[in-house]
């Protein structure tokens, strides 16, 4: 019978934080790919990722305003994806270190 140690619990929590950040970044990247690739906006998959990506983009959604809509999505949502990756990595390390 294995016992659940504090270090195991902390490791799981840190891993969950990391995976959440990765999933947020993945949603944003898929939205960028669908937008830049001119996916049909009426398609259910495209609508799902567009709807899911908007709140994840936070303030990055309108950070840069180039005239080209594809470039705007690529830069702003791409920066938001990087943000989620960095924040989740930092939080994961902090959780492991402080616990």
Feature-to-residue mapping (PLM):
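Membrane-interface elements of multi-pass transporters and channels
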Residues: 36-41, 67, 94-98
């Amino acid at each position: 019978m294995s016992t659940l140690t504090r270090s195991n619990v902390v490791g799981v929590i840190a891993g969950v934080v990391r995976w959440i950040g990765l999933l947020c970044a993945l949603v944003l990247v898929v939205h960028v790919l669908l937008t830049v690739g001119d996916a049909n906006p009426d398609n259910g998959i495209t609508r799902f990722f567009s709807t899911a990506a908007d709140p994840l983009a936070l303030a990055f959604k309108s950070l840069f305003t180039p005239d080209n809509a594809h470039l705007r999505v690529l830069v702003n949502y791409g920066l938001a994806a990087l943000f989620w990756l960095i924040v989740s990595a930092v939080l994961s390390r902090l959780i492991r270190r402080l616990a």
